[in-house]
Amino acid sequence: VADDVPAIAICLGAQVAAEALGGSTAVPALGNDEVGVVELTITAAGESDPVFGAVAAEAIRAAHRAGIRTSDGTRFPVIVSHHDAVTHLPEAAILLASSDRSPVHTWRAGRLLAFQHHPESDPARVAYWRTRDALNDLAGTMDAASLKAARDALEVAAGRSAAPGAAGTHGATAADLPEAAASAGAAAREEAERVDPAIQAFGRTLARVLVRNVRA
């Protein structure tokens, strides 16, 4: 920031950047944690930001075309997965967007642009996160062998292991996932697929704007 170098910080990166610049975070951020799809509300500074404003506007247009609500062009969906959060911005930072549950979401400090959400994510990853969290919630009700088989099955389903029976998975399959965890992941994926046009528009536009700014 002090050297005026353009940079992007995402999720944990945004939290680390906030701490480094004099802000504060909560670990864990009880009441501010989020997983799945949430709506961001853009601030006036966000609308006029040379990067975020243009990217958010394109995401909102894509949402409108897909029939996704935008609350008169002030809100759009993003994908999140965080249990920690920035609670106070650095003094020099400007808030660009908030969610209902997590007030500090997108912000800028100099040429650093920080996102609490994951612009690079997709429905498959959302399903993985939500299934993983559901498994963690169920861990106390499962024996060690069943829990390991379920976690192995999740890794196989997510493509993090080559195939059932790959090293370390011991032949785990989708049948080893508890129904509650599998259902949670499926519901999260369905919700993410519904808003995917806006998610993809945000990611593509962000990439184009960043490349254009670097070349300028």
Task: Give the location of each predicted region.
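Flexible gly/pro-rich beta->alpha loop and the following alpha-helix that scaffold active-site loops
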Residues: 1-9
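Generic, well-ordered alpha-helical segments
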Residues: 8-9, 32, 194, 198
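Gly/Ala-rich beta-loop-alpha elbow adjacent to hydrolase catalytic centers
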Residues: 9, 13, 18
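Hydrophobic aliphatic residues
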Residues: 20-21, 130
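A broad structural signal for alpha-helix termini and local helix breaks/kinks
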Residues: 21-22, 214
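Pocket-forming structural segment of enzyme catalytic cores
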Residues: 22-125
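Acyltransferase
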Residues: 120-216
